[in-house]
Amino acid sequence: MSLSDPIADFLTRLRNGQAGMNKVVYVPCSKVVMAVLRILVEEGYIESFTEEVRGDSGIKVLKVFLKYFNSAAAIRKIVRVSRPGKRVYSSADKMPRFYNALGIYIVSTSKGIMLDSHARNAGVGGEILCGVF
């Protein structure tokens, strides 16, 4: 199956998994998705993730362990900002804040994928991939 937007697919799988109160979600493996997952683990939005090989075909998937607080999902809202049809870029000085800095933006910069606050501090702009609250 060919995906035109693997990040949107990944975010949708997370959203649907938490809506269904699942403990684990499987996501197709990619470097960008792994970088976003590392940030989500560091910020406390998900428990952890591991890389697995599924079946005899040798397809790599990421097993994501979702996080809940008192049976409520740790991620209240997760949205895709920059899409293949409409890219959204921002410079470091004009980087927006998600939910008045209560949430985070994940930004793809020339120095790698990082939080919006780290991009502002480093003085680099980039493509705003998604917002998490």
UniProtKB/Swiss-Prot annotation:
Keywords: Ribonucleoprotein, Ribosomal protein, RNA-binding, rRNA-binding
GO molecular function: rRNA binding; structural constituent of ribosome
GO cellular component, one term: ribosome
Pfam families: Ribosomal_S8
Biological-process GO terms, alphabetical: translation
Protein task: One of the primary rRNA binding proteins, it binds directly to 16S rRNA central domain where it helps coordinate assembly of the platform of the 30S subunit.
Subunit structure: Part of the 30S ribosomal subunit. Contacts proteins S5 and S12.
Family of the protein in this entry: Belongs to the universal ribosomal protein uS8 family.
HAMAP family linked: Ribosomal_uS8_B
PANTHER family attached to this UniProt entry: 40S RIBOSOMAL PROTEIN S15A
Stated name of the protein: Small ribosomal subunit protein uS8
Gene this protein is translated from: rpsH
